[in-house]
A protein has these predicted regions:
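Catalytic domains that recognize anionic headgroups
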Residues: 1-110
Length: 110
């Protein structure tokens, strides 16, 4: 982790691919993923819950509110884990003006 990240460290694409057979077997996962596709998804907090959901793995650690294949996906404020392993809000990191402009250009909420 960097003490002060740049836009390029924060903007990580989140891709999901489902086969035709999977989409036919689990149409609710496909529908929810499509419904959530334009939301401001945080890949770091959504990847693990989404993979557990897609695989049908039940565990007390699974948080479906962070799964993009769940009907009740909840947007949370974005945070960055700094070099002291502490979550910090993006607007409190001392990022450059250009980084915030790029976040806004890509419609990434913070």
């Amino acid at each position: 982790a960097s003490p002060v990240p740049s836009y390029y460290q924060l903007h990580v694409p989140f891709l999901i691919w489902m086969s035709d057979n999977y989409r036919e077997t689990y149409p609710e996962h496909w529908k929810n993923a499509v419904d959530n596709k334009d939301k401001n998804i945080s890949s770091s907090s959504s990847f693990f819950p989404t993979m557990l959901s897609l695989a049908g793995i039940e565990t007390p650690y699974r948080d479906d509110s962070q799964s993009v294949t769940a009907p009740h996906y909840v947007l949370k404020p974005r945070v960055y884990l700094n070099d002291h392993n502490e979550p910090r809000p993006l607007d409190d990191l001392g990022m450059k003006k250009q980084d915030f402009q790029m976040l806004e250009k890509r419609n990434i909420k913070y």
